UniProtKB/Swiss-Prot annotation:
Binding locations of GTP: 18-25, 86-90, 140-143
Keywords: Cytoplasm, GTP-binding, Nucleotide-binding, Protein biosynthesis
Protein name per the record: Peptide chain release factor 3
Organism superkingdom: Bacteria
Role according to the record: Increases the formation of ribosomal termination complexes and stimulates activities of RF-1 and RF-2. It binds guanine nucleotides and has strong preference for UGA stop codons. It may interact directly with the ribosome. The stimulation of RF-1 and RF-2 is significantly reduced by GTP and GDP, but not by GMP.
Gene3D superfamilies, sorted: P-loop containing nucleotide triphosphate hydrolases, Peptide chain release factor 3, domain III
Native source species: Xanthomonas axonopodis pv. citri (strain 306)
């Protein structure tokens, strides 16, 4: 086996997806804690204290207590290297989360035991479906009263359309919580309350028949449990590795992240069964992770990760080959050779200079405005990774300055923020308006906050008569020009120089589509096909 094959086989790159408040950031912390990456988990509840959760590091996030930007954390575990990509927890950040899901090989879905499958989880699941991403499920907050576990499995199967294979099963919940049974190994992990923030090893009995177990959980509960397990094992699916890796079955675990409970069995199972880096599609061919030459794509751009150094960092997922510090690569979109010096690896906000990286790893490349989302880097081959779309925004605002002299800073700020995916930015052909598009209202708050904080620009966002946007393409240049002339009042250019139809109403969009049958109106735009613009 080559060194690349060896290292790729050790990698497990995944993201955690959930509805806001299902306990995702807490679980992220606990995985890092069990992985030995942090000594003390900064519980999200302790916000007011100095101990902020390690993965929420932007000032706005610390103020609001939600993860707005996705961060990347790497830790070794049981001979494997785990790359955990945290995703924004707030409902408005669908697009950023979507892009993170393009960079992972599997996902972990967190569900609140009391609330079950929620709206945001359904949306994220749809995104995972597009790529058949393998998914494990952690049903969290078992220390509180919640829905019946059998009903929860049924809900996941019905609402999300994926088969459930329970791997651990709860012994009671809320006040009566006694532990979980591992359905594959037969072990019983006891629940011992204690919100200590250091690694906690629970008491484990080898089986339900082990001496001493009945004293711990009581005869009645043990009898109820045996009955329930018979029912569960008769009615549910046994774990099937191929079905899981094909995205058709989800192994299910129960636990309480805040109490460090049930996390260890999940992590052990994850590193053993989750897929290593997979084959990736490009515009020209399929790229295997074990290829000797480096290739990778940018799935996120983050401005000002370091307030001391007003910098921007492009997050690149390595897809094949080996990255070494200072190596020369081809930036495919611009056709220029770029030396990747001082690339970073991440442990949330702590950065270290990366000496090397392998398939599945994520590195940070310093970006001075030349790198965009979806850009591909190779060792010379001209190919572009596909499947990293921009979604048509659902909300629009016009940016207006309180101080008209700051126009240049506003344009620069909006261009940079749209490049990193915080918002989308459109310029109508027939006016000097600057129109922002977003998937949710909070995005506008974040942009306003960052414009003020990072660019010194005080901007107001006003309503604008745009309901939806579609990217327009036509194979016949003459017909496109005709369409452009007739519809100039509703057309604009996005930050990448692409033509966009800004529809004032859904009816208007429908009419425009009927009147121009040769023009394609798309609700998404592939990043891989973006032209370079100044």
């Amino acid at each position: 086996m080559s060194e690349v094959s060896n290292e790729a086989a050790r990698r497990r790159t995944f993201a955690i997806i959930s509805h806001p408040d299902a306990g995702k950031t807490t679980l992220t912390e606990k995985l890092l804690l069990f992985g030995g990456a942090i000594q003390m988990a900064g519980s999200v509840k302790g916000r007011k204290a100095a101990r902020h959760a390690t993965s929420d590091w932007m000032a706005l996030e610390k103020e609001r207590g939600i993860s707005v930007t996705s961060s990347v954390m790497q830790f070794p575990y049981e001979g494997k290297i785990v790359n955990l990509l945290d995703t924004p927890g707030h409902a408005d950040f669908g697009e950023d989360t979507y892009r993170v899901l393009t960079a992972v090989d599997s996902a972990l879905m967190v569900i609140d035991v009391a609330k079950g499958v929620e709206e945001r989880t359904i949306k994220l699941m749809e995104v995972c479906r597009l790529r058949d991403t393998p998914i494990m499920t952690f049903i969290n907050k078992l220390d509180r009263e919640g829905k019946n576990p059998i009903d929860l499995l049924d809900e996941v199967e019905t609402v999300l359309g994926i088969q459930c294979a329970p791997v651990t099963w709860p012994i009671g919940m809320g006040q009566r919580l006694k532990g979980v049974v591992h359905l594959i190994s037969g072990e019983v992990h006891l629940y011992e309350q204690g919100r200590n923030f250091t690694r906690q090893d629970s008491t484990i009995f080898p089986s339900l028949d082990a001496p001493g177990l009945v004293e711990k959980i009581g005869e009645q509960m043990l009898a109820e449990l045996r009955e329930e397990l018979e029912l569960v094992q008769g009615a549910s699916n046994p774990f099937d590795l191929d079905a899981y890796r094909a995205g058709q079955q989800t192994p299910v675990f129960f636990g309480s992240g805040v109490n460090n409970f049930g996390v260890q069995p999940l992590l052990d199972f994850f590193v053993e069964h989750a897929p290593p880096p997979q084959t990736r599609e490009t515009t020209g061919r399929r790229v295997e992770p074990t290829e000797a030459k480096l290739s990778g794509f940018v799935f996120k751009i983050q401005a000002n990760m370091d307030p001391q150094h007003r910098d921007r960092v492009a997050f690149m997922r390595v897809c094949s080959g080996k990255f070494t510090a200072g190596m020369k690569t081809l930036h495919v979109r611009s056709g220029k050779d770029v030396k990747l010096a001082n690339a970073l690896t991440f442990m949330a906000s702590d950065r270290e200079i990366a000496a090397e990286a392998w398939p599945g790893d994520v590195i940070g490349i310093h970006n001075h405005g030349t790198i965009s989302i979806g850009d591909t880097f190779t060792e010379g081959e001209s190919l572009s990774f596909t499947g990293i779309p921009n979604f048509a925004p659902e909300l629009f605002r016009r940016a207006r300055l309180r101080d008209p002299l700051k126009l240049k800073q506003l344009q620069k700020g909006l261009a940079q923020l749209s490049e990193e995916g915080a918002t989308q930015f459109f310029r109508p052909l027939m006016s000097n308006d600057l129109i922002l598009g977003a998937v949710g209202v909070l995005q506008f708050d974040v942009v306003a906050y960052r414009l003020k904080d990072e660019y010194g620009v005080d901007a107001i966002f006003e309503p604008v008569s745009v309901t939806t946007a579609r990217w327009v393409h036509c194979d016949n240049p003459k017909k496109l020009e005709e369409f452009r002339e007739k519809n100039a009042g509703n057309l604009g250019i996005d930050a990448a120089g692409e033509l966009v139809y800004l529809a004032p109403t859904r009816v208007n969009l429908q009419l425009a589509q009927e009147r121009a049958p040769d023009v394609r109106f798309s609700a998404t735009r592939e990043h891989a096909h973006v032209k370079a613009v100044d």
